[in-house]
């Protein structure tokens, strides 16, 4: 039989009472990415507007900022992280989950050697699996390289999008093709696969097909 934890809902977090946690415990959350890469114009005024002569965009550093519509929740999360002695990362058990969590921790200036970091690493949302996961928390820093990998991918995607999108858009506009064209590491190859499939459908020619049952 499972013990039903008591929870008190607050603004942006829950206060939890459960035998699993002997100390004062809070559960908070993000929605989407609370922290994201800054826009090009934040680095240099010449990158505020799309101009071919301003390309390529390669900042000397990469800054992260709180998403404009998520400032309230970030402030709540940041305050809880700062006062916590132990932080349990319970985002999705993959690289992107690590990236979301650690981006918030670093932006909140909540990373400290004086804090203990733990990781809930589970692959199911069944009650028994979640409870077992909390009973067997992993050292949080063991998964930190996943965050570094994901952030590297995030920056690479940003560079491709912020350079390729204006490059193609401006060149096409010079040729009389109006509109804005978004390019990306994943979306552009995927779009081409869709195009290839559509071409195959439109150019399909019926051919006789014989089935030999002998």
Indicate where each model-derived feature is located.
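Prokaryote-biased recognition of long, low-complexity C-terminal linker/tail segments
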Residues: 153, 157-214
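Intrinsically disordered, low-complexity regulatory segments
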Residues: 1-162
């Amino acid at each position: 039989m499972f013990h039903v934890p008591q929870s008190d809902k607050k603004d942006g977090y829950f206060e939890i009472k459960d035998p699993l946690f002997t100390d004062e415990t809070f559960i908070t959350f993000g929605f989407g990415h609370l922290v994201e890469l800054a826009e090009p114009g934040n680095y240099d005024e010449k990158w505020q507007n799309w101009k071919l002569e301003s390309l390529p965009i390669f900042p000397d550093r990469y800054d992260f900022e709180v998403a404009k519509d998520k400032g309230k929740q970030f402030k709540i999360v940041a305050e809880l992280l700062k006062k916590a002695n132990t932080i349990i990362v319970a985002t999705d058990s993959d690289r992107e989950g690590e990236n979301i969590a650690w981006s918030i921790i670093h932006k909140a200036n909540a990373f400290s050697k004086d804090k203990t970091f733990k990781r809930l690493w589970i692959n199911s949302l069944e009650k028994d699996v979640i409870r077992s996961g909390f009973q067997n928390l992993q050292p949080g820093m063991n998964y930190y390289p996943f965050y570094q990998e994901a952030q590297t991918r995030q920056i690479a995607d940003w560079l491709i999008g912020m350079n390729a999108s204006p490059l193609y858009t401006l060149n096409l506009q010079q040729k009389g093709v109006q509109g804005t064209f978004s390019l990306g590491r994943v979306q552009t190859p995927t779009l081409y696969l869709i195009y290839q499939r559509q071409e195959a459908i439109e150019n399909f020619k019926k051919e006789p097909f014989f089935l030999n049952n002998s």
